[in-house]
Amino acid sequence: MKRFVIGIGGVTNGGKTTLAKSLQKHLPNCSVISQDDFFKPESEIDIDENGFLQYDVLEALNMEKMMSAVSCWMENPGSSAGPAALESAQGVPILIIEGFLLFNYKPLDTIWNRSYFLTVPYEECKRRRSTRVYEPPDPPGYFDGHVWPMYLKHRQEMSSITWDIVYLDGTRSEEDLFSQVYEDVKQELEKQNGL
C-alpha cells in the first residue's frame, strides 16, 4: 500500500505544530504524530553542570515508543481516519511527524517523502519562547544556556543529511507557510499517484 510521510522539523516555537495541524485539517486521510508527546518524565531527564534539565536532546525522548507509533501507522495507515477518508480522491494515507529532533534520529531517515524545517532567528525565537508556559517552567538563562545552543548543535549535525529538506522561514505568516507546504505536498501526491 502506498503511504506518504511528511517530516516537519525545526527550532523550538518555530510553528511546527501549527503547520502540522493546518495540513491535517486540509489533507484527506491524514494523521499526525508529535515528538513532544514522547518526552520522558522529568525524573528521567539529565541535568547539566549549570543545573539545566536537558530536554533538548534525543535522550530526553522515548524515541523507541515514538518509533513504535510510527511503525503501527505504517502497518495500518488508514486506521485513524475512518472509511470515508480511505475512499478520498487522494487515496494515499498521509502521516505527518512533527518535532524538533526528527532529522537527527537515524531510524527515521528512510521514511520521509517530504521534509520541511522551520527556522526562526534568535531574537524572535527567544521572544516566542518567553510567551509559552512550560512544565516544568524554563529557569532564568535556560534559553541562552541550553535551548539555543542545542538548536545550533543539532542544526549543524543536519549538514550531513543526504535527502532534500525544504527550509522554511518561520517568521512568515501561518497562512503563507501552510499554502507553500500544502501546494508542495499536493504536487508530490499527484506525482506519486501518476496524475
From Swiss-Prot:
Gene3D superfamilies xref list: P-loop containing nucleotide triphosphate hydrolases
GO MF term set: ATP binding; metal ion binding; nicotinate riboside kinase activity; ribosylnicotinamide kinase activity; ribosylnicotinate kinase activity
SUPFAM superfamilies registered for this protein in UniProt: P-loop containing nucleoside triphosphate hydrolases
Gene Ontology annotations for the cellular component aspect, listed alphabetically: cytosol
Binding site for ATP: 10-18, 128, 132-134, 172-174
Reactions that this protein is recorded to catalyse: beta-nicotinamide D-riboside + ATP = beta-nicotinamide D-ribonucleotide + ADP + H(+); beta-D-ribosylnicotinate + ATP = nicotinate beta-D-ribonucleotide + ADP + H(+)
Family from the record: Belongs to the uridine kinase family. NRK subfamily.
Pathway connected to this protein: Cofactor biosynthesis; NAD(+) biosynthesis
Any one Gene Ontology BP term: NADP biosynthetic process
Class of enzymatic activity (EC top level): transferase
Gene field: Nmrk1
PANTHER family: URIDINE KINASE
Binding site for substrate: D36, D37, F38, F39, Y55, D56, R129, Y134, E135
The UniProt record lists the keyword Nuclease: no
Quaternary structure (record): Monomer.
Keywords from the UniProt entry: ATP-binding, Kinase, Magnesium, Metal-binding, Nucleotide-binding, Pyridine nucleotide biosynthesis, Transferase
Name assigned to this protein: Nicotinamide riboside kinase 1
Catalytic residue positions: D36
EC numbers: 2.7.1.22, 2.7.1.173
Binding site for Mg(2+): T17, D36
Superkingdom of the source species: Eukaryota
Database matches in InterPro entries: P-loop_NTPase
Role according to the record: Catalyzes the phosphorylation of nicotinamide riboside (NR) and nicotinic acid riboside (NaR) to form nicotinamide mononucleotide (NMN) and nicotinic acid mononucleotide (NaMN).
Species this chain originates from: Mus musculus
